[in-house]
Swiss-Prot record:
This protein binds to the 23S rRNA, and is important in its secondary structure. It is located near the subunit interface in the base of the L7/L12 stalk, and near the tRNA binding site of the peptidyltransferase center. Coiled coil: none annotated. Belongs to the universal ribosomal protein uL6 family. The lineage of its organism: Bacteria, Pseudomonadati, Thermodesulfobacteriota, Desulfobacteria, Desulfobacterales. GO terms for cellular component: cytosolic large ribosomal subunit. Pfam families: Ribosomal_L6. GO terms for molecular function: rRNA binding; structural constituent of ribosome. The keyword tRNA-binding does not apply. SUPFAM superfamilies: Ribosomal protein L6. This is Large ribosomal subunit protein uL6. PANTHER family: 60S/50S RIBOSOMAL PROTEIN L6/L9, LARGE RIBOSOMAL SUBUNIT PROTEIN UL6M. One of its GO terms (biological process) is cytoplasmic translation. It comes from Desulforapulum autotrophicum (strain ATCC 43914 / DSM 3382 / VKM B-1955 / HRM2).
Length: 180
């Protein structure tokens, strides 16, 4: 049995969890999320807890699915109750970001500004022109959007210029040694 999968997930007060067939729906104050379940995974809702179990606990792949779906359900519950946020820093001379409706306009050293269309359910906020904050209820979409924006201009190892996560540390390389 999966150690993570065995732990039940606590359901907060303002969150509703329902299972219909192979679809789980979670509604909360921030919104609602749906996900289809694998045929080998079973969910049981008892006493304000969600228990994840599998049909065959001897097969390694289904045991791995138990831990996976337990984590996915926990992330969905956290998303609809609290939400997720990722911060990106723009480091470089003249690097800045601005939000126009559903588009983030990035000036990151290219000859033209880069227009990045935000996916549905993601909101962006710019603080001090160099900090971009992405928020939403789906952890996967927030993380994927942050990774796609970072990929536009990843930080380079010599000066650290580029787009980086707020908690990321760039290991800088030494430059060329001067000629003697």
């Amino acid at each position: 049995m999966s150690r993570i999968g065995k732990k039940p997930v606590q359901i907060p007060e303002k969150v509703e969890v329902s299972v219909k067939g192979d679809l789980i729906s979670i509604k909360g104050p921030k919104g609602s999320l749906d996900r289809s379940l694998h045929p080998a995974v079973k969910l049981a809702i008892e006493n304000g807890m969600v228990n994840v179990s599998v049909t065959d606990d001897q097969d390694r792949k289904t045991v791995a699915l138990q831990g996976l779906f337990r984590s996915l359900v926990a992330n969905m519950i956290t998303g609809v109750s609290v939400g997720y946020e990722k911060k990106l820093l723009l480091n470089g001379i003249g690097y800045r970001a601005e939000v126009n409706g559903n588009t983030v306009v990035l000036n990151v050293g290219y000859s033209n500004p880069v227009n990045f269309e935000l996916p549905k359910g993601i909101s962006a906020l710019v603080e001090k022109n160099t900090t971009l904050s992405l928020s939403g209820i789906d952890k996967e979409i927030v993380g994927e959007t942050a990774a796609r924006i970072r990929r536009i201009r990843p930080p380079e190892p010599y000066k650290g210029k580029g787009i980086m996560y707020s908690d990321e540390r760039i290991i800088k390389k030494a430059g060329k040694a001067a000629a003697k």
